[in-house]
Curated annotation (Swiss-Prot):
GO terms for molecular function: 1,4-alpha-glucan branching enzyme activity; cation binding; hydrolase activity, hydrolyzing O-glycosyl compounds. The active site is at 416 (nucleophile), 469 (proton donor). The lineage of its organism: Bacteria, Pseudomonadati, Pseudomonadota, Gammaproteobacteria, Alteromonadales. It catalyses: Transfers a segment of a (1->4)-alpha-D-glucan chain to a primary hydroxy group in a similar glucan chain. It comes from Shewanella baltica (strain OS155 / ATCC BAA-1091). It comes from the Bacteria. Keywords: Carbohydrate metabolism, Glycogen biosynthesis, Glycogen metabolism, Glycosyltransferase, Transferase. The keyword Transferase applies. This is 1,4-alpha-glucan branching enzyme GlgB. One of its GO terms (biological process) is glycogen biosynthetic process. GO terms for cellular component: cytosol.
């Protein structure tokens, strides 16, 4: 028997609710005072329900049976003589089962006014704690609090496994003042799939993944996933304390860039990714043995297209499913720290893809992106550019950076494509871009965002490293923000990389005419805090591997590569090397398969790997190679003009009491005997490293491990020595005692 709708619903409210057009659902559904406070009424909308009883949660007693208003699932009824609100559940009889459902429409808003203010202002650092899907408890009831920013949507519902993806079942509470929609849902389980169903102002319906989801489905599926309640228990206190006390610009920093999906694979055909436990057991010991101080991970935020390598993320807060869950990732970072290895994360804040389930026109308007394509579309990648002028977008990005550093203990972020953020005309022709308020080409909003980001992160997370991939001559990338700089800790030295790799590809006979390509970088080495990077971008898209770039026979290729690494490790600046380069991978990188580890069955590849390992260990052991990386006093040319022989000689200095190191690099196959070099100290010297040693695959030309200085001034030094310079080789020479002071 049906009860007339007008007995419980305002005129037309029932019809609007059934049609999904009643947005202020909390004023209608749930428990409300009626009859001037002399009664309570409960209304609910449960499709396919046969009957509904109201049960007191406190004592489990049935309070009332609701009247069925119509066949579509509207129920309502008064609660006898009760006038004081109480917690209740709905006991719902369906054709095949009975369910107890804690009514979500009986709960007040769980949002905090301070959080809302900071989010709108653009300074929220923990927006992920109230946006997205978070486990909460209110009035003794546990559930998931769903919240999403969609100010221009007409209606937003949360849909998922728990409501059979019915968009009318869980319409969310709208906050008109700030554009947030929320709903606290009991009866939701860990691992439940969900999305947000949005009705745009034009009436269109679109289902979107949660922008703040911390877990997502495997592509091609794109549902968000309710996270687990259990959290990783950290054991890296010693590392975090050490990190906070370390001045990284004065410390050795040698990063191994890794694409987790192709470093190594498993399965009979190499078709399976390693999971985080595999990586703990295999990658960490390898990196430790090779002497790298850090791992830099290419992006691991969820991304649908493997070929993007992670640089087109859709789930910025969700660690990709490919290698395990969030707790697995935390365990991996924890294990890195316990092994004494830092871990940097590639972070994509310059753009986002147009996947329809993602951020694009999220609420029917250009919410996260600029509306004008001259500012909102990236022409190179056909992606969208964040609107850095919008407070909520800044909070979304700032909170995401904090999320990875706070919740996952990453030791820093490497920001991708910073140049594209800094300039409004980046990759655009005249007429395709809009000038800033002063008529210039600088993106003032993006610059301001980067300054705030770096300032906030360095303040909140002591000892982190913020690294910029920035390829232009933009001034002050690593200057502090109070000096009008961007505030990064380090900047990739793209100029050094391009020049040195170009030199590497020259025939040794003609390198004398391009000598400046290896010396020019010292003209600007102290204008920024540079990191020398040979990244994935240099060994892909037809560029070939490093070994492939080098002319000559195999012996010359391997010898040149070893000498090049010697020059790189001796040059001022921190280091980054892409995986596979450390053993001389022959093929260019392929993200769809493992590195060619079988090459290590061959001695030349073993030699390059051993050389890199020894360089790294020397780099960590000798302060001269890092403590004055960004001070002119830390480097001195002995001879930068010997283009005829293509030989480069220089000294690296540490602080008082640190042994200086002399580098001699020969970039031709010519052996030089009786070659005189200046030395900073008198006495005996030790040949610390010789890339031409037989153990590295060389011809064993050198100085038998020792060099003796004589009192003959040379190259501006009070003493010198005659040495043998091996072909295509690198020598690293230092005082045998290691303690005397240089002139």
């Amino acid at each position: 028997m049906m009860t007339q709708a007008n007995a419980y619903f305002y005129d037309g409210a029932d019809v609007a609710l059934l049609n999904g057009q009643y947005t202020d659902v909390f004023s209608l559904l749930g428990m409300h005072s009626a009859n001037e406070g002399k009664a309570l009424i409960v209304r609910c909308f449960l499709r396919n329900a046969i009957s509904v009883d109201v049960i007191s949660i406190k004592d489990g007693r049935k309070v009332a049976s609701l009247d069925k208003v119509n066949e579509q699932g509207l129920f309502a009824g008064t609660l006898g003589r009760r006038v004081k609100p109480f917690l209740y559940l709905l006991r719902v009889e369906y054709p095949l089962c009975q369910l107890d459902i804690v009514d979500p429409y009986q709960f007040d808003s769980l949002l905090n006014s301070d959080d809302i203010y900071l989010f709108g202002e653009g300074s929220a650092e923990r927006a992920y704690e109230f946006l997205g899907a978070n486990w909460r408890q209110t009035q003794g009831v546990e559930g998931v609090h769903f919240c999403v920013w969609a100010p221009n949507a007409k209606r937003v519902s949360v849909v998922g496994d728990f409501n059979h993806w019915d968009d009318t079942r869980h319409v969310m509470r709208q906050h008109l003042a700030n554009g947030l929609w929320e709903l606290f849902l009991p009866n939701v389980v860990e691992g439940a799939h969900y999305k947000f169903d949005l009705v745009y102002q034009n009436g269109e319906r679109h289902t979107k993944s949660d922008p703040m989801a911390t877990q997502m489905e495997c592509a091609p599926h794109n549902a968000s996933i309710v996270p687990p309640k259990a959290h990783h228990s950290w054991n890296d206190t010693a590392w975090m304390s050490k990190r906070a006390a370390t001045a990284w610009h004065k410390a050795p920093m040698s990063a191994y860039e890794v694409h987790l999906g192709s470093w190594r694979r498993k399965g009979e055909q190499g078709e399976q990714y390693l999971d985080y436990q595999d990586l703990i057991e295999q990658l960490i010991p390898y990196v430790k043995e090779q002497g790298f101080t850090h791992i830099e991970l290419m992006p691991i935020s969820e991304f649908p297209f493997d070929g993007s390598w992670g640089y087109q993320p859709v789930g910025l807060y969700a660690p990709t499913h490919r290698f395990g869950d969030a707790n697995g990732l935390k365990a991996f970072v924890d294990a890195c720290h316990q092994a004494g290895i830092g871990i940097i994360l590639d972070w994509v804040s310059a753009h986002f893809p147009k996947d329809p389930h993602g951020l694009v026109r999220f609420d029917g308007t250009c919410l996260y992106e600029h509306e004008d394509p001259r500012k909102g579309t990236h022409p190179d990648w056909d992606t969208l550019i964040y609107n850095y002028d919008r407070g909520e977008v800044r909070s979304f990005l700032l909170s995401n950076a904090c999320y990875w550093l706070r919740e996952f203990h990453f030791d820093g972020l490497r920001l991708d494509a910073v140049s594209s953020m800094l300039y409004l005309d980046y990759s655009r022709e005249p007429g395709q871009w809009l000038p800033n308020a002063y008529g210039g080409r600088e993106n003032l909003e993006a610059i301001s965002f980067l300054q705030i980001l770096n300032q906030r992160l360095y303040q909140a997370f002591p000892g982190i490293c913020m690294i910029a991939e920035e390829s232009t001559a933009f001034a002050g990338v690593t200057k502090p923000t109070d000096q009008q700089g961007l505030g990064f800790g380090f900047k990739w030295n793209m100029g050094w990389m391009n020049d040195s790799l170009s030199y590497l590809g020259r025939d040794p006979l003609y390198r004398q005419f391009h000598h400046h390509q290896l010396t020019f970088s010292l003209m600007y080495a102290y204008t920024e805090q540079f990191m020398l990077s040979v990244s994935h971008d240099e060994v892909v898209h037809g560029k070939g591997s490093l070994l492939h770039k080098i002319p000559g026979d195999d012996w010359q290729k391997f010898a040149t590569l070893r000498a090049y690494y010697g020059f790189m490790w001796g040059h001022p600046g921190k280091k980054l090397l892409f995986m596979g380069c450390e053993f001389g991978q022959r093929n260019e990188w392929n993200h769809n398969q493992s590195l060619d580890w079988h090459l290590l069955a061959y001695e030349p590849h073993q030699g390059v790997q051993r050389w890199l390992k020894d360089l790294n260990h020397l780099y960590q052991a000798m302060p001269a190679l890092s403590v004055q990386d960004y001070e002119g006093a830390g480097f001195s040319w002995l001879d930068c003009e010997n283009s005829r022989d293509s030989i480069f000689t220089f000294v690296r200095y540490g602080l008082a009491g640190d042994a200086p190191l002399v580098f001699v690099i020969n970039m031709t196959p010519q052996l030089h005997t009786g070659f005189r070099i200046g030395l900073p100290l008198a006495g005996d010297y030790r040949e610390y490293l010789n890339s031409d040693s037989q153990i590295y695959g060389g011809s064993n030309q050198g100085n038998a491990g020792t060099v003796v200085a004589e009192s003959l001034p040379w190259q501006g030094m009070a003493q010198s020595a005659l040495i043998t310079v091996p072909p295509l080789g690198c020598l690293v020479i230092g005082p045998a005692t290691g303690l005397a002071e240089a002139n």
